[in-house]
């Protein structure tokens, strides 16, 4: 039995609220149960120096946790003067995941930055950030298309992510913090709308896990991500 009493293949309650920031070209507040992540998309009419004069744009991401996103207050990384390795790893993952479904040439020489701020953390913040960031990015590119800034849609498809793990010997979908901190194995899957793999992170925490268990986790991830794709489409109006 899972602590939340969910079935092994059941996502937490997922919510996607759009238009939560009046200034950003795209914004989304995504919830996976008690995990809440605010994502804003900012369009800038320039690209990093190493991308100049290449006729293509760039999509990048930043990730951070608000001080009281967890049970105890965490110091702001800005106050500490540097980002942790975890933060850098996660924001690179978010950027890679989004670029997998973007035609950078169609974007033109402009950059879209997805700022992912964890308001409340209860496991799965990186996967929630990726799933919500796609919604904010899609809204930002739709804005650019509607305004006539872009002539060709740069979005090639959807991307979403979910965690899976082995908890009490059973493969389960979408781990919350209690499950994640006690899992025998955990993983994160990032898949596109056509089923391509962008990234898989899988780790044996308390023991190694078998190929059969991995395939079970993969199957759970596909099921959960397909449900997330439907929620993404509903959030952007189809």
From Swiss-Prot:
Q: Which PROSITE patterns match?
A: RIBONUCLEASE_PH
Chain positions recorded as phosphate binding sites: 86, 124-126
Quote the InterPro entries the UniProt record gives: ExoRNase_PH_dom1, ExoRNase_PH_dom2, ExoRNase_PH_dom2_sf, PNPase/RNase_PH_dom_sf, Ribosomal_Su5_D2-typ_SF, RNase_PH, RNase_PH_bac-type, RNase_PH_CS
Q: Which Pfam families match?
A: RNase_PH (PF01138), RNase_PH_C (PF03725)
Which enzyme class? transferase
Cited CDD domains: RNase_PH_bact
Q: What is its EC number?
A: 2.7.7.56
SUPFAM superfamilies in the cross-refs: Ribonuclease PH domain 2-like (SSF55666), Ribosomal protein S5 domain 2-like (SSF54211)
Q: Which reaction does it catalyse?
A: tRNA(n+1) + phosphate = tRNA(n) + a ribonucleoside 5'-diphosphate
Q: Which residues form the signal peptide?
A: none
Q: Which key words tag this protein in UniProt?
A: Nucleotidyltransferase, RNA-binding, rRNA processing, Transferase, tRNA processing, tRNA-binding
| Entry annotated with the keyword Metal-binding | no
Which molecular function terms from Gene Ontology are attached? 3'-5'-RNA exonuclease activity; tRNA binding; tRNA nucleotidyltransferase activity
Any single GO BP term: rRNA processing
Which family does the entry's similarity section mention? Belongs to the RNase PH family.
Role description = Phosphorolytic 3'-5' exoribonuclease that plays an important role in tRNA 3'-end maturation. Removes nucleotide residues following the 3'-CCA terminus of tRNAs; can also add nucleotides to the ends of RNA molecules by using nucleoside diphosphates as substrates, but this may not be physiologically important. Probably plays a role in initiation of 16S rRNA degradation (leading to ribosome degradation) during starvation.
Quaternary structure and interacting proteins, as annotated: Homohexameric ring arranged as a trimer of dimers.
Q: What is this protein called?
A: Ribonuclease PH
Q: Which organism is it from?
A: Caulobacter vibrioides (strain NA1000 / CB15N)
Gene name, per UniProt, is rph
């Amino acid at each position: 039995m899972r602590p939340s009493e969910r079935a092994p293949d059941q996502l937490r309650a997922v919510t996607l609220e759009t238009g939560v920031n009046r200034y950003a070209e795209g914004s989304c507040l995504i919830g996976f149960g008690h995990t809440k992540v605010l994502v804003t998309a900012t369009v800038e009419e320039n690209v990093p120096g190493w991308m100049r004069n290449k006729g293509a744009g760039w999509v990048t991401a930043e990730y951070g946790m608000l001080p009281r996103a967890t049970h105890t207050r965490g110091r702001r990384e800005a106050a500490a003067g540097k980002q942790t390795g975890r933060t850098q790893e996660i924001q690179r993952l978010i950027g890679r995941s989004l670029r997998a479904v973007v035609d950078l040439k169609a974007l033109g020489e402009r950059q879209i930055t997805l700022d992912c701020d964890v308001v409340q953390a209860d496991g799965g913040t990186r996967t929630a950030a990726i799933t919500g960031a796609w919604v904010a990015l899609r809204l930002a590119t739709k804005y650019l298309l509607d305004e006539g800034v872009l002539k060709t849609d740069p979005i090639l498809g959807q991307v979403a992510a979910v965690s899976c793990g082995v908890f009490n010997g059973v493969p389960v979908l979408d781990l919350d913090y209690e499950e994640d901190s006690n899992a025998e194995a955990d993983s994160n899957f990032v898949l596109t709308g056509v089923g391509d793999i962008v990234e898989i992170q899988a780790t044996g925490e308390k023991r190694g896990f078998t190929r059969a268990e991995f395939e079970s986790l993969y199957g759970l991830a596909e099921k959960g991500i397909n449900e997330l794709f439907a929620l993404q489409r509903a959030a952007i109006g189809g």
